[in-house]
Amino acid sequence: MITDSQIFFALCIALTAAVLAIGLGRQLYV
C-alpha cells in the first residue's frame, strides 16, 4: 500500500530533482 507520506516524499524528491535540473541547465547555457 502507498501512504500519503510516501506520496508526499516522492513529490518532494521530484520537485528537488526538477529544480536541480533547471539550475544545471541554466549554468550550461550561460
From Swiss-Prot:
<protein>
    <recommendedName>
        <fullName>Photosystem I reaction center subunit XII</fullName>
    </recommendedName>
</protein>
<dbReference type="InterPro" id="IPR010010">
    <property type="entry name" value="PSI_PsaM"/>
</dbReference>
<keyword id="KW-1133">Transmembrane helix</keyword>
<keyword id="KW-0150">Chloroplast</keyword>
<dbReference type="GO" id="GO:0015979">
    <property type="term" value="P:photosynthesis"/>
</dbReference>
<keyword id="KW-0603">Photosystem I</keyword>
<keyword id="KW-0934">Plastid</keyword>
<dbReference type="InterPro" id="IPR037279">
    <property type="entry name" value="PSI_PsaM_sf"/>
</dbReference>
<feature type="transmembrane region" description="Helical">
    <location>
        <begin position="5"/>
        <end position="25"/>
    </location>
</feature>
<keyword id="KW-0812">Transmembrane</keyword>
<keyword id="KW-0793">Thylakoid</keyword>
<dbReference type="Pfam" id="PF07465">
    <property type="entry name" value="PsaM"/>
</dbReference>
<dbReference type="GO" id="GO:0009522">
    <property type="term" value="C:photosystem I"/>
</dbReference>
<keyword id="KW-0472">Membrane</keyword>
<comment type="similarity">
    <text>Belongs to the PsaM family.</text>
</comment>
<dbReference type="GO" id="GO:0009535">
    <property type="term" value="C:chloroplast thylakoid membrane"/>
</dbReference>
<keyword id="KW-0602">Photosynthesis</keyword>
